UniProtKB/Swiss-Prot annotation:
Keywords: Cell membrane, Lipoprotein, Membrane, Palmitate, Signal
Protein name as annotated: Putative lipoprotein SCO4651
Domain of life: Bacteria
InterPro entries: LolA/LolB/LppX (IPR029046)
Membrane topology recorded in Swiss-Prot or TrEMBL: Lipid-anchor
Signal peptide segment: 1-24
Chain residues carrying a lipid of type N-palmitoyl cysteine: 25
GO cellular component entries: plasma membrane
Chain residues carrying a lipid of type S-diacylglycerol cysteine: 25
Subcellular location: Cell membrane
Length: 282
């Protein structure tokens, strides 16, 4: 088996997609109508509702630096333990642009289908033991995918830091009536705002900010579509990065529904830790 493993192109999108992905929102009792609520207050209320997320089902489409156009659909369980299943395609990358990612039992599995099997003696999945590998060099080879163990709802709070939040209008998203809000926020302002947060929140947001800093993004234009239950139904973020534009839209198809994720069949999996060990011995 080859010990020099090239992760499928789609897998390199994982961090960005997961980080930008689940901005949505825990279900709570519908708030009383409040026509006087300012755009900033409405956005803050929707962002607050992300704190009780248990699970979600969402779709993502857009563009990311280098890879270009992407689409993905995922189911994720946040509580009581993290688990995730995502199918993604980098539309401009041909056969190498399709990948499936599963996160279960503190291990990440990245499947590249037939293309990956050609390079790994017929095995189409690579296993990364996140607990054992930590932040080591091997895990860093995944780039964005190494961030899959963080709560992806963090970015939903970024719009609350915008100084120019405004109401765009009323729009229907996936058959649901929503109010569309828009604003811009700089990473510098977000960095400054961390000083007022508790350590757990500060660490979580800092981890997300670092991903954008690495891409060279210094300002984000953000849109949020909020439904009648003060929940985020759709979310969009745009920015200019060093290697191309970022423009991602996330639409929520379901929240707090059962999520079941299983590991791929053992016979189809190549364990990266074992492969690295064999390489060192060889």
């Amino acid at each position: 088996m080859k010990t020099s493993v090239r992760v499928p192109v789609g897998a390199g999108l994982a961090a960005l997609l997961l980080a930008a992905g689940a901005v949505g929102c825990a279900k709570e009792d519908k708030a009383s109508e409040s026509p006087e609520m300012t755009p900033a207050a409405a956005v803050a209320k929707a962002a607050k509702n992300t704190e009780e997320i248990n699970s979600l089902h969402y779709r993502m489409t857009g563009k990311v630096p280098e890879e270009g156009r992407v689409k993905a659909e995922a189911e994720m369980q946040i509580k009581p333990t993290l688990a995730m299943s995502m199918k993604m395609t980098a539309l401009d990358q041909g056969a190498e642009g399709t990948a499936e990612i599963r996160l279960v039992d503190k291990a990440m599995y990245i499947g590249g289908g037939p293309e990956a099997a050609k390079e790994m003696d017929g095995k189409s999945w690579i296993k990364f033991d996140l607990a054992a590998m930590g932040a080591g060099d091997e895990l860093n080879q995944l780039g964005g995918a190494s961030q899959a163990d963080k709560n992806p709802a963090t970015e939903s709070t970024f719009l609350t830091g915008a100084k120019d939040v405004e109401k765009v209008g009323t729009e229907t998203v996936e058959g649901v009536k929503t109010t569309h809000y828009k604003g811009t926020v700089t990473l510098a302002d977000l960095e400054k705002s961390l000083a007022d947060e508790d350590k757990a929140t500060r660490d979580k947001r800092q981890k997300s900010l670092e991903q954008y800093e690495k891409m060279g993004v210094d300002k984000l234009t953000m849109d949020m579509w909020v439904d009648g239950d003060d929940q985020t139904k759709q979310f969009r973020m745009r920015g200019d990065a060093k290697k191309g534009p970022l423009d991602m839209t996330i639409t929520f198809l379901g929240i707090n529904e059962p999520v079941k994720v299983t590991a791929p069949p053992a016979g189809e999996v190549a364990d990266l830790a074992e492969m690295m060990k064999e390489s060192q011995q060889g």
